[in-house]
């Protein structure tokens, strides 16, 4: 949008909404007309209007962008093309003319002429007519002050995420009491969002220009920003100390990749405003371009404010005067007074809508994507662009005809889609209002966030026409605008799951400074879904990737466009609009997913019944075993004979279809009885032997049976009292005189068995199932447990459960052997079967390895009845073929089947071949793919009815409305959705989803999350009691306080249980299910725990803070369980609480700590633990402070600038994980806690152009462990760090490895040891000590060197020795590329070395240094007569005990000059080593900081070359190596190193054990050849051997010059050694 060419006047104002977290950023687009252009006021000829009315008409025409002659004054504002945005503008213009009217009156007007007449009838509204000769600004521009009016339209870009690596207002930021109390409600809310979710509520605005206009823009912006009061003080502390009003930085890049990268970098770190210019230098220069990026916190501006500023900038560019706006704090005070005076009206308004808001649904019923690895606290957003399918012209025609605004159509379309996706007739989402319609001075001109977001709640009646709905929606919007000044204190909440924004463009300018690309805006958001409507009708759907998948949002966008199409015919009813949203493509997808095209799901496909199938099996395999119990068995022929005898007798007592109850005792005669009942034409009903007699009596009575069958004479005592006749199978089978008959034709439509299930009230429901359903179900081999001749099927399920039906008839209908339980062990027979059905609870306690036959891969195991957990899936599917089956009894045993595999997500799978499945809403309409609805089962498997329950049967068994062939479907009451690959994901019962205090809660999901958060709890039962949740947990020994504290950290406040009961077992219903009603009663009887009195100093401090912030009287008693929320605290007061406590403890208490610990004892314990809490930093002239970096860090930063993608500066640790011994979750938690407590690990290194130096900034979020399945250790160890954008540390936990990688800029080996020590301690349950001393307040770096030290170094290094004779000297370093070569020092040499070191005062480091100094001569050049060389060693540089426990980089390089030759009188070995030892001791004794040494010697640093020395030598003893370990069982330290070369040559000795010494040569491949390295690998062990054997110095040199033929050194392959446990090398 052009930035100049603005006329002197004639601005018109429009609002444009852009969504941000819980708010909208409202841009004002200003249209303009040439100031002195003649305006044709074409009034209707039959009407005479006074001058005042003419001015209003002129203003109206300007607002609507039409000629006055085109206005129809006999119609309303909307009919003339007005909308809510232009209404705001017209009200503002009228106000400037002295006419007061409301937005509601103008929007609801139906006759403009009458409106104007009424307005101007009052003297108070008479408009002063200007003198025509007056040369002042035209009244067509009511905002023609020197401040100007908003004028630029800025296209919206996608909302973007804020990564933890970016630098923003941190969680540890502390607000002063003054600042907190002086904030407006909106500012406090925005700041609260930033503190709780760092990086949110920051706006980035981009404009791209020709490079040569940037200086003009800079001057204009500087003038404007420095003039506005709101930028003059810090919102964090209310002061202007060290506050830069205007910050401007510039960076120049030469490639497009660098340019794009700079544009993507988000840098704002505080509540401030900042500018950054990215210059892209191109050839030719005229093609260069520059992008100006304005970053500003939303607590400083809203969109209206931004456009006021834009307008002033344009005026400044043209040299026009600029007048600052009024003080925001002054305007805010007036607004507060207004709110107080009108509070009762606001309270009354929202109280009137409270019931509707409570019932409204705003949450899309879409599943969250499955997370990969560990969950992250980072809010990540992506955008989906939805192209328009309906033009604005079409919609405008509809809107004009109905007298509503265009935006009403878009709001209505989203309401339709939201109603479908929320399965609710009442929906709510966010709507924004400018907040500038109050009749208060300064509201129109002030810069500051006056914007407000209100809940828009709508009810969609299906019988209502779309046009009536549009009109009602428009009226609702008008009404809402009248209360845009209200805040949540008036009784509403801003809990929006979605929100919509409209974009309105402005005109283009024809001259002046103009952007060469359309401007755009990026902004952070914590609203899960925002819909931004573009000017052409397209939409941008910006969504949180943690909450929605891209496929779901793409589909959502299509439905939104389809809704707009449906609204083009507004006469149709809302029901038709909702039904029309499901398109043909999705309908076809759903039909395919649901198995709707298969005839196998229909009754016409069934030609057999259970009896004919059994008899066919008998005829084919008469002598095969049919049923076995221990040593007793029956063949198919015997079973058929016995069952035939039972049937012959039964026919004398029953009619076809009569129910016969059978005593189910798991005996062979029980099976005989079942088949006898069916062969007689009866219906089998089991009376479980294990049930109480009262329950058996109830079932018998409900079944309608008059006859009772028992397997044996000993069972007669179980006969129900109402039984008319008792028959004994044991007697019946002995009668060989009865005729044995077989069924002449199948009867699939007849009833087969009656199975009782428990209802929600505990009263059993009898489900009547048909032959055809079970025959259809078991027709598939995989479904029927692979039952066939030769296979053995276990009978293990409860005889009262339809799982036993599946076992029995799968086997007996297809010739398999049914194996019954025998003996005392109910699972013993599993060792002798090929197929078995288990519940997941059984599988959890059983070990497949304990059952010889069951543990084979060919064995098929089916899990039914409960959700399958991942651990059960993994353990069992590794050893056998495992299936998950789902289906209620009413759907005949099973509806879906899914083979499970190790470490793959558990689902219930697609429909089985004989079932149709639908997922429907409450109106029994198909929901779109991926949307959560209720699962329905349709087709041949649907049972007949509930016996004796016609009302419940009518409710649950209904006609199939999808496949209309006269069949029925069953309403399961289970919630689920279709996955992308057509599998059903079952989420639990619908009656476990509730609405509590305005929030929709899934109680099953909450139970799962609680168990996951606190593994010591084995089960959770959650239920509702009034407006609170009650939780019962197992076992009774659980630490309830610890559980409560942990749950409060992972669940939102409204989902946290108010009472928690620890029980030995849950109360159950008669059917054995959890009795939630009984749990609620137990909770009601239990007293509310008030905790104890406050005793510890921290508890008292927190209690005092509670009392102060909440203004509690002395009569309010506080105790350890006192809750901040229950005492009246809310999110905004948490800001002040965090500040108050931080000041009290002199440590930064982040907002998230306060938010996660609501109770006094929990919060006090969290603060006492010290985890993640940093000391409040005070300016210490002797410490680094918050932003300064240490000189050694600066040294490494400069090295990184040579090649930031290098991995050579990575410090790493890796351990191999024993899966049986290591608790990965605990390891991840321990590592996260340790990384979070050291703030230096959040460092970002940023070059500040203003400061002219590199500064440290902090990410608000601590680094987090990445949990992955697999990892490539070499790739992970060598991933480079981006110092400005990412954390300087990362940790990965895979199935096999734990890898910790740190940039050398923040770590040395001591730091690595500290971190590993703390991780080990925390992993094993130890507590971590507080951190009294941090890297940032270390005073070490400001120590001044003594003159004695400096004199030493002048003498030592004043003139450096010649290096032309050394290996590697001739090469030119181009970077930090390099390799590592590894070899083993011969064990005999290492043993001699260890013996020598024990007998002398020489250290291993000194001996190694002496060795390397002798080996570096290049054989191709003449050898010097003496040794004179400078080598480097690592200097720990930790000079105090407290420094030894500080995480950070202290290690510095230290030069050691070794000079020894012919002038030395004693050339013995001891003399040479003594010289080396003295040299090392002297260097260490006179050590000064590296930067001080270089400055003193006046040596410049030119990376990658290293000053003073090129070779570094280090020796890691075995004890040192042991410090680099996680001291916990199952973690084995591996050998690692990073790729590349930090120096020309690094010689690193590592003692792996008492007899293994490894030598790694890290070398620059531009300087050393492979032959050089091979020579060093031969020389170094040889020199070491000679030195420890007392060989004279001269002889050693001669030997190295002409080495003898010796045993070659054992060279190790780097790819073999890397990643190998140290003990295995």
Swiss-Prot record:
Domain of life of the organism encoding this protein: Eukaryota
Keywords in alphabetical order: Ligase, Phosphopantetheine, Phosphoprotein, Repeat
Biological process, per Gene Ontology: amino acid activation for nonribosomal peptide biosynthetic process; secondary metabolite biosynthetic process
S-S bonds: none
Domain Carrier, residue spans: 47-123, 1096-1171
Positions of the UniProt region annotated as Condensation 1: 286-567
Enzyme class at the top of the EC tree: ligase
Ranges where the record places region Adenylation: 614-997
Region ranges (Disordered): 127-157
GO molecular function: ligase activity; phosphopantetheine binding
Pathway linked to the protein: Mycotoxin biosynthesis
EC number(s) reported in the record: 6.3.2.-
Record remark: domains: NRP synthetases are composed of discrete domains (adenylation (A), thiolation (T) or peptidyl carrier protein (PCP) and condensation (C) domains) which when grouped together are referred to as a single module. Each module is responsible for the recognition (via the A domain) and incorporation of a single amino acid into the growing peptide product. Thus, an NRP synthetase is generally composed of one or more modules and can terminate in a thioesterase domain (TE) that releases the newly synthesized peptide from the enzyme.
Annotated function: Nonribosomal peptide synthetase; part of the gene cluster that mediates the biosynthesis of aspirochlorine (or antibiotic A30641), an unusual halogenated spiro compound with distinctive antifungal properties due to selective inhibition of protein biosynthesis, and which is also active against bacteria, viruses, and murine tumor cells. The non-ribosomal peptide synthetase (NRPS) aclP is responsible the formation of the diketopiperazine (DKP) core from the condensation of 2 phenylalanine residues.
PANTHER family noted in UniProt: NONRIBOSOMAL PEPTIDE SYNTHETASE, NONRIBOSOMAL PEPTIDE SYNTHETASE 5
Name used for this protein in its record: Nonribosomal peptide synthetase aclP
Encoding gene (name): aclP
């Amino acid at each position: 949008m052009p930035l100049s060419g603005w006329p002197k006047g004639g601005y018109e104002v429009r609002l444009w909404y852009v969504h941000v977290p819980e708010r909208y950023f409202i841009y004002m687009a200003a249209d303009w007309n040439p100031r002195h252009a003649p305006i044709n006021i074409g009034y209707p000829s039959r009407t005479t209007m006074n001058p005042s009315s003419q001015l209003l008409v002129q203003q109206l025409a300007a607002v609507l962008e039409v000629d006055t002659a085109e206005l129809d004054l006999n119609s309303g504002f909307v009919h003339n093309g007005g909308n809510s945005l232009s209404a705001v503008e017209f009200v503002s213009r009228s106000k400037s003319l002295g006419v007061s009217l409301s937005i509601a009156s103008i929007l609801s007007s139906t006759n403009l002429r009458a409106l104007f007449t009424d307005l101007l009838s009052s003297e108070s509204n008479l408009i002063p007519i200007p003198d025509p000769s007056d040369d002042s600004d035209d009244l067509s521009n009511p905002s023609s002050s020197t401040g100007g009016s908003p004028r630029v339209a800025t296209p919206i870009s996608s909302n973007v995420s804020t990564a933890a690596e970016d630098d923003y207002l941190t969680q540890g930021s502390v607000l002063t009491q003054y600042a907190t109390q002086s904030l407006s409600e909106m500012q406090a809310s925005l700041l609260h969002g930033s503190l709780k979710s760092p990086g949110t509520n920051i706006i980035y605005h981009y404009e791209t220009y020709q490079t040569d206009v940037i200086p003009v823009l800079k001057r204009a912006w500087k003038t404007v920003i420095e003039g506005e009061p709101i930028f003059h003080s810090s919102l964090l502390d209310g002061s202007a100390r060290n506050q830069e009003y205007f910050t401007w930085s510039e960076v120049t890049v030469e490639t497009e990749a660098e340019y794009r990268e700079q544009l993507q970098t988000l840098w704002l770190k505080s509540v401030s405003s900042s500018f950054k210019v990215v210059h892209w230098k191109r050839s030719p220069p005229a093609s260069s371009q520059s992008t100006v990026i304005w970053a500003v916190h939303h607590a400083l501006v809203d969109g209206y404010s931004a456009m006021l500023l834009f307008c002033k900038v344009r005026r400044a560019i043209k040299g026009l005067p600029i007048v600052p706006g009024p003080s925001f704090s002054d305007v805010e005070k007036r607004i507060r007074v207004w709110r107080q005076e009108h509070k009762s009206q606001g309270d009354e308004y929202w109280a009137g809508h409270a019931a509707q808001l409570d019932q409204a649904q705003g949450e899309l019923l879409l599943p969250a994507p499955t997370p990969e690895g560990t969950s992250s606290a980072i809010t990540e957003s992506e955008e989906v662009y939805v192209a328009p399918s309906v033009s604005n012209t079409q919609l405008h025609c509809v809107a004009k005809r109905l007298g509503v605004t265009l935006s009403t159509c878009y709001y209505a379309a989203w309401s339709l889609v939201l109603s479908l996706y929320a399965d609710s007739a009442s929906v709510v989402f966010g709507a924004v209002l400018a907040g500038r319609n109050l009749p208060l001075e300064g509201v129109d001109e002030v810069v500051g966030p006056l914007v407000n977001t209100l809940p828009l709640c709508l009810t969609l009646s299906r019988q209502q026409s779309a046009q009536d709905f549009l009109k009602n929606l428009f009226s609702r919007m008008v009404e809402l605008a009248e209360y845009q000044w209200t805040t949540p204190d008036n009784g509403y909440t801003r809990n929006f799951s979605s929100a919509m924004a409209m974009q309105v463009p402005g005109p283009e300018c024809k001259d002046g400074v103009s952007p060469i690309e359309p401007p755009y805006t990026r902004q952070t958001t914590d609203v899960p879904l925002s819909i931004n409507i573009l000017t052409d009708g397209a939409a941008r759907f910006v969504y949180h990737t943690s909450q929605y998948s891209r496929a779901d949002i793409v589909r959502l966008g299509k439905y939104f466009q389809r809704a707009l199409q449906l609204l083009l015919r507004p006469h149709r009813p809302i029901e038709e609009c909702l039904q029309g949203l499901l398109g043909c493509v999705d309908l076809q997808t759903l039909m395919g997913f649901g198995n709707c095209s298969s005839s196998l799901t229909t009754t016409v496909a069934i030609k057999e019944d259970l009896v004919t199938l059994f008899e066919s099996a008998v005829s084919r395999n008469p002598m095969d075993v049919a049923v076995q119990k221990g040593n007793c068995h029956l063949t198919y022929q015997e079973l058929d004979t016995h069952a035939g005898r039972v049937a012959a007798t039964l026919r004398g007592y029953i009619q076809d279809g009569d129910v016969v109850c059978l005593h189910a005792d798991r005996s062979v005669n029980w099976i005989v009885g079942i088949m006898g009942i069916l062969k007689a034409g009866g219906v089998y009903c089991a009376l479980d032997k294990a049930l109480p007699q009262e329950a058996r009596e109830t079932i018998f009575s409900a079944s309608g049976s008059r006859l009772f069958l028992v397997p044996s004479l000993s069972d007669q005592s179980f006969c129900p009292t109402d039984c008319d006749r008792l028959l004994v199978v044991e007697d019946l089978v002995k009668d060989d005189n009865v005729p044995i008959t077989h069924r002449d034709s199948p009867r699939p439509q007849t009833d087969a068995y009656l199975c009782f299930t428990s209802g929600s009230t505990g009263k059993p429901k009898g489900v009547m199932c048909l032959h055809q359903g079970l025959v259809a179900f078991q027709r598939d081999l995989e479904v029927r447990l692979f039952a066939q001749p030769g296979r053995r099927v276990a009978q293990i399920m409860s005889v009262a459960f339809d799982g036993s039906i599946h076992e029995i008839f799968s086997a007996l209908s297809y010739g398999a052997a049914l194996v019954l339980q025998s003996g005392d062990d109910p699972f013993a027979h599993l060792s002798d079967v090929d197929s078995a059905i288990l519940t997941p609870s059984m599988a959890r306690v059983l070990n497949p390895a304990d059952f010889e036959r069951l543990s084979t891969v060919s064995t098929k195991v089916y899990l039914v009845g409960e959700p399958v957990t991942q651990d059960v899936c993994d353990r069992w599917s590794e050893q056998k073929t495992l299936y998950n089956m789902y289906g209620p009894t009413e759907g005949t045993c099973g509806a879906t089947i899914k083979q499970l595999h190790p470490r793959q997500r558990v689902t219930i799978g697609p429909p089985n071949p004989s079932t149709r499945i639908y997922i429907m809403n409450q109106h029994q309409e198909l929901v779109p793919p991926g949307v959560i609805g209720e699962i329905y089962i349709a087709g041949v498997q649907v049972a007949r009815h509930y016996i004796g329950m016609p009302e419940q049967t009518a409710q649950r068994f209904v006609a199939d409305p999808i496949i209309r062939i006269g069949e029925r479907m069953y309403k399961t009451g289970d919630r689920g959705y279709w996955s992308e690959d057509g599998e059903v994901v079952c989420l639990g019962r619908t009656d476990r989803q509730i609405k509590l205090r305005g929030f929709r809660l899934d109680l099953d999901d909450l139970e799962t999350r609680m168990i996951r958060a606190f593994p010591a709890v084995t089960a959770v039962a959650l239920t509702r009691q009034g407006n609170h949740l009650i939780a019962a947990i197992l076992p009774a020994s659980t630490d309830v306080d610890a559980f409560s504290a942990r749950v409060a950290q992972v669940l939102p406040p409204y989902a946290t249980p108010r009472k928690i009961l620890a029980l030995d077992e849950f109360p159950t219903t008669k059917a054995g299910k959890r009795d939630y009603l009984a749990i609620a009663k137990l909770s009601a009887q239990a007293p509310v725990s008030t905790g104890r009195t406050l005793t510890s100093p921290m508890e008292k401090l927190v209690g005092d803070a509670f009392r102060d912030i909440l203004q509690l009287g002395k009569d309010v008693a506080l105790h350890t369980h006192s809750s901040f929320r229950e005492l009246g605290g809310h999110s905004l007061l948490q800001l002040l609480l965090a500040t108050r406590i931080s000041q009290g403890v002199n440590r930064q208490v982040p907002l998230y700590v306060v938010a996660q610990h609501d109770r006094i004892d929990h919060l006090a314990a969290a603060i006492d633990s010290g985890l993640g809490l940093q000391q409040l930093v005070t300016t210490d002239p002797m410490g680094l402070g918050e932003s300064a970096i240490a000189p050694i860090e600066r040294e490494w930063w400069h090295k990184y600038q040579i090649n930031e993608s290098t991995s050579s500066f990575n410090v790493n640790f890796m351990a191999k994980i024993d899966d049986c011994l290591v608790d990965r979750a605990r390891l991840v938690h321990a590592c996260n806690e340790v990384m979070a407590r050291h703030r230096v690990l959040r460092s970002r290194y940023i070059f500040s152009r203003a400061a002219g130096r590199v500064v440290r900034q902090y990410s608000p979020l601590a680094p987090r462990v990445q949990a992955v399945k697999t990892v490539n250790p070499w790739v992970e160890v060598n991933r480079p760090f981006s110092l400005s954008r990412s954390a300087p540390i990362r940790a990965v936990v895979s199935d096999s490895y734990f890898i910790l990688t740190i940039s050398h800029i923040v770590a040395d080996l001591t730091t690595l040891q500290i971190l590993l020590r703390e991780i080990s301690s925390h992993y094993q349950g130890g507590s971590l000590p507080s951190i009294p001393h941090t890297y940032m307040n270390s005073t070490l770096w400001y120590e001044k060197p003594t003159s004695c030290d400096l004199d030493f170094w002048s003498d030592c290094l004043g003139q450096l020795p010649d290096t032309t004779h050394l290996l590697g000297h001739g090469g030119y370093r181009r970077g930090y590329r390099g390799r590592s070569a590894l070899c083993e020092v011969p064990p005999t040499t290492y043993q001699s070395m260890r013996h020598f070191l024990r007998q002398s005062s020489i250290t291993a480091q000194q001996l190694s240094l002496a060795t390397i100094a002798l080996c570096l001569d290049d054989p191709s050049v003449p050898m010097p007569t003496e040794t004179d060389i400078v080598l480097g060693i690592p200097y720990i540089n930790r000079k105090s005990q407290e420094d030894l426990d500080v995480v950070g980089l202290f290690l510095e390089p230290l030069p050691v000059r070794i000079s020894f030759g012919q002038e030395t009188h004693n050339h013995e070995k001891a003399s040479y080593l003594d010289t080396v030892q003295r040299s090392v001791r002297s260097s260490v004794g006179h050590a000064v900081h590296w930067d001080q040494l270089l400055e003193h010697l006046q040596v410049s640093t030119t990376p990658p070359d290293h000053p003073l020395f090129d070779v570094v030598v280090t020796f890691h003893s075995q004890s040192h190596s042991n410090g680099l370990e996680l001291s916990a069982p199952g973690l084995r330290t591996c050998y690692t190193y990073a790729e590349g070369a930090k120096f020309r040559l690094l010689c690193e000795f590592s003692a792996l054990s008492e007899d293994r010494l490894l030598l790694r040569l890290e070398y620059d491949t531009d300087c050393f050849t492979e032959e050089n390295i091979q020579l060093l690998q031969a020389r170094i062990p040889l020199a070491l051997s000679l030195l420890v054997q007392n060989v004279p110095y001269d002889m050693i040199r001669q030997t190295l010059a002409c080495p003898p033929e010796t045993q070659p050194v054992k060279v190790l392959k780097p790819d073999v050694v890397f990643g190998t446990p140290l003990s295995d090398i």
